[in-house]
Amino acid sequence: FGPSSQDEGSFEFTEIGLNVSLRPHQDVLLAAQMLSRRAGGDSSDAYPKLDYGLIDYQMVSDQQRTFGIQLGRIKNPFGFYNQTRDVAFTRPSILLPQSLYFDRTRSLALTGDGVTLYLEERLDNGVIRGQLGLGKPQADKDLNQTLRLHRRPGSFEPQQSAIAQLRYEDD
């Protein structure tokens, strides 16, 4: 990454996270993660910030199905890797394919502040998983710089948006 192929390595790609997960009741999960990340650029973009922070309430959880709701800053169900893109061993490479997971505008696609409903239905031959979310996407300074919005009059303010994902996993 960066000048590592020309020299003896590089510290231009660094990630460190601190997460906490607490289950105050068998149906309730509180979880949060602070993340400091730098992918090229200067060290000023490595300040820690809230990656996700949520309250998860499972209304139904048994052998057949799981149904719940999450409130807070939630990872968007976008593509295969977005929800786990900051977990190194879930990535196929150091950086995800940039055609889908563009790191320069990652704040817009990564998380949103809002609510998500989720369902997991276990069938005889597989599992159906679905998520439906409503929230306000994050728009950090990386988005304004990448899209060169600081050169234009006005401002970029994200609006409420919806996102959904439906998956089937065969046994």
Where are these regions (language model features)?
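Loop-centered beta-sheet repeat module
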Residues: P137-D171
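Surface-exposed strand-loop-strand hairpins of Gram-negative outer-membrane beta-barrel proteins
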Residues: F1-T14, Q145-R152
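Outer membrane beta-barrel
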Residues: D7-D140, L166-D170
